[in-house]
């Protein structure tokens, strides 16, 4: 995680929001009586595998192209070592899901170590933890097998182990190894698997679905990278929407995300061509998403395919009777998640290692069906899926993938929600501040995706604009139930969308927290359960605010969307002390990236005089006053 540092262009005094006396400042008076309820799960995460945020990102498996998956397999990331060559072998399948394996052809006069290497996803992050590797091998061989992690350019070894293994040409056998490592200075590390060339000379060996894991979050098998999971945990989000997003839709009905192909052993998962230009291994599958929720204390929000592929791909949308097999598939998925072991799919879940049903309460039907030709048919499709799911699971909250009335049934079913997405310019987000004041309050809202766009990195102007937008929906969080910034994660080496909340490379600890990350963290970690009335002698703009309470604690969130300092008095009867957290920079274009960290929050303890706090808010600033 990036350490706190001084902000450029703002003095340390301003950073700490030094107390000032200014009779002409803006006055905010927070009522301690009454108020509207605020959703307890307001802030959370939207995740799909974009920007190698899953494979190569938060998913712990580090080898790229581990199983040569897909109908057009290739040797991306693989290379030969020593007196040998490698090739794709489609005649020695590992399983029906993994029809191709790597054939290692060893020279007749081979000596020394021969084998194969994998470069990972633009490197391998060796962090000094214990590593675990597994692989399948077929071919007549009895001898040493060595697994090493070695510097790509330096040859420095960061960890290794050697085992003795016997395999035959008849069947694949699996081997697993564990070994300690020392921390590498960067991600330029290769995975190397070798056999004794003098023993294997003149023969060939096949290798299938190789894996490499370091320590995982909460030691989950096939789990998450702790470095990224910890950063998310620091935000204290409340929910996780998965698996997308566009990556749920796919480019055709056949290419959609298929839940039943993401479960079981890794060698039984065929993977799929993802929507964001690269193949998904689906090692991060249905079980792993629910364990992610369990381990970070998140409410799962499951997206299901609803007969519409991205941009009407593959002759979708499907309607009428053509939807029946896909509705049945969703019902099977829900039985897998929620059914006890007396049910067909609940028993299958238990056989895959999860005896107890998961606690799923929310399902979203489709993704952005207002786009790409989906709107006209969505009312029919939503109703068909809603009716079937609600009949079988009446307690589930079902969410429409759009809030646009033209795409929805004339009357939404009681208890259903709608999903509102907003990617916009900074001024566009600020312009939406009042949008949520005027909602039909009988239909709850999920803001499933939002952020500033059309820039490489979140900057202060955009992050303050997002804060204004967030203040707008938090003021209305009796009807706005959940909201998530998107996209969440970004491997710097392979990016399909910017800006993103959190960036990283494969160098250990190389994580870049954006200005927008800090806004999300500040707002999520400081939440009340009741939104309080605030009276002021000023209109909204350029200063925006919202106040909430939880018991005797009060939270006032502020955003200064402008270039002038704002002097403030904030009155909260009965309070005496508070903590001020501020993110600010006088340059609206200031940003954090992989090459610089210019803007981080600062905190100070402040005292009230008769329940009144007096301070100044710098230009282009987001602040939270937590008082009691």
UniProtKB/Swiss-Prot annotation:
Enzyme Commission identifier(s): 3.2.1.55
Residues of the signal peptide: 1-25
Keywords of this entry: Glycoprotein, Glycosidase, Hydrolase, Signal
Pfam families xref list: Alpha-L-AF_C (PF06964), ASD1_dom (PF22848)
Known catalytic reactions: Hydrolysis of terminal non-reducing alpha-L-arabinofuranoside residues in alpha-L-arabinosides
Gene, per the UniProt record: abfA
SMART domains linked to this entry: Alpha-L-AF_C
GO molecular function: alpha-L-arabinofuranosidase activity
Family assignment from sequence similarity: Belongs to the glycosyl hydrolase 51 family.
Entry keyword annotation includes rRNA-binding: no
Pathway: Glycan metabolism; L-arabinan degradation
GO BP annotations, alphabetical order: arabinan catabolic process; L-arabinose metabolic process
Protein name per its UniProtKB record: Alpha-L-arabinofuranosidase A
Annotated organism of origin: Aspergillus niger
Enzyme class: hydrolase
Lineage: Eukaryota, Fungi, Dikarya, Ascomycota, Pezizomycotina
SUPFAM superfamilies: (Trans)glycosidases, Glycosyl hydrolase domain
Protein purpose: Acts only on small linear 1,5-alpha-linked L-arabinofuranosyl oligosaccharides.
Glycosylation sites: 36, 51, 74, 152, 171, 260, 359, 440, 493, 610
């Amino acid at each position: 995680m990036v350490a706190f540092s001084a902000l450029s262009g703002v003095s340390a005094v301003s950073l700490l929001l030094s107390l000032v006396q200014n009779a002409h400042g803006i006055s905010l008076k927070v009522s301690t009586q009454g108020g509207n309820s605020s959703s307890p799960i307001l802030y959370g995460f939207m995740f799909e595998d974009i920007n190698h945020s899953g494979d190569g990102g938060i998913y712990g498996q580090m080898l790229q192209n581990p199983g040569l998956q897909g109908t057009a397999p290739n040797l991306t990331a693989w290379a030969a070592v020593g007196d040998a060559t490698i090739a794709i072998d489609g005649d020695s399948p590992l399983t029906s899901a993994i029809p191709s394996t790597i054939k290692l052809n060893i020279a007749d006069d081979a000596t020394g170590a021969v084998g194969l290497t994998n470069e990972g996803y633009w490197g391998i992050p060796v962090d000094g933890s214990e590593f675990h590797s597994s692989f399948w091998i077929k071919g007549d061989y009895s001898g040493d097998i060595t697994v090493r992690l070695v510097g790509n350019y330096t040859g420095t070894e960061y960890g290794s182990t050697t085992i003795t293994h016997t395999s035959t040409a008849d069947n694949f056998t699996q081997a697993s190894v564990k070994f300690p490592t020392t921390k590498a200075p960067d991600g330029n590390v290769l995975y190397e698997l070798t056999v004794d060339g003098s023993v294997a000379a003149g023969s060939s060996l096949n290798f299938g679905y190789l894996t490499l894991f370091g320590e995982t979050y909460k030691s989950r098998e096939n789990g998450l990278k702790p470095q990224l999971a910890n950063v998310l945990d620091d935000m204290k989000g409340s929910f996780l929407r998965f698996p997308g997003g566009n990556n749920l839709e796919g480019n055709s009905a056949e290419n959609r995300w298929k839940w039943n192909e993401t479960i079981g052993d890794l060698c039984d998962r065929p993977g799929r061509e993802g929507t964001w230009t690269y193949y998904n291994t689906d090692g991060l599958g249905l079980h792993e998403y629910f364990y992610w929720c369990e381990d970070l204390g998140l409410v799962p929000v499951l997206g299901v395919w609803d007969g519409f592929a991205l941009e009407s791909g593959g002759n979708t949308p499907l309607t009428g009777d053509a939807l029946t097999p896909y509705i049945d598939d969703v019902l099977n998925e829900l039985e897998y998640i929620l059914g006890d072991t007396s049910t067909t799919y609940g028993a299958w879940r238990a056989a895959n290692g999860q005896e107890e049903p998961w606690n799923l309460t929310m399902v979203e039907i489709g993704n952005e069906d207002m786009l790409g030709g989906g709107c006209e048919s969505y009312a029919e499709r939503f109703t068909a899926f809603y009716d079937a799911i609600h009949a079988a699971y009446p307690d589930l909250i079902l969410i429409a993938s759009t809030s646009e009335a033209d795409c929805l049934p004339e009357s939404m079913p009681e208890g259903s929600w709608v999903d509102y997405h907003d990617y916009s310019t900074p001024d566009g987000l600020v312009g939406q501040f009042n949008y949520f004041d005027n909602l039909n309050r009988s239909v709850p809202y999920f803001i499933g995706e939002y952020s500033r766009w059309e820039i490489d990195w979140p900057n202060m102007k955009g992050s303050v604009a997002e804060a204004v937008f967030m203040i707008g929906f938090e003021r209305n969080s009796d009807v706005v139930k959940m909201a998530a910034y998107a996209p969440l994660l970004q491997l710097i080496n392979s990016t399909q969308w910017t800006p993103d909340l959190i960036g990283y490379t494969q160098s250990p600890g190389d994580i870049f927290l954006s200005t927008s990350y800090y806004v999300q963290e500040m707002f999520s970690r400081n939440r009340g359960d009741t939104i309080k009335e605030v009276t002021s002698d000023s209109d909204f703009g350029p200063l925006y605010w919202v106040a909430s309470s939880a018991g005797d604690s009060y939270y006032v969130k502020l955003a200064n969307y402008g270039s002038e300092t704002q002097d403030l008095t904030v009155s909260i009867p009965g309070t005496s002390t508070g903590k001020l957290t501020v993110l600010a920079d006088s340059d609206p274009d200031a940003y954090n990236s992989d090459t610089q960290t210019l803007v981080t929050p600062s905190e100070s303890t402040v005292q009230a005089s008769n329940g009144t706090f007096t301070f100044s808010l710098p230009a282009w600033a987001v602040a939270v006053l937590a008082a009691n």
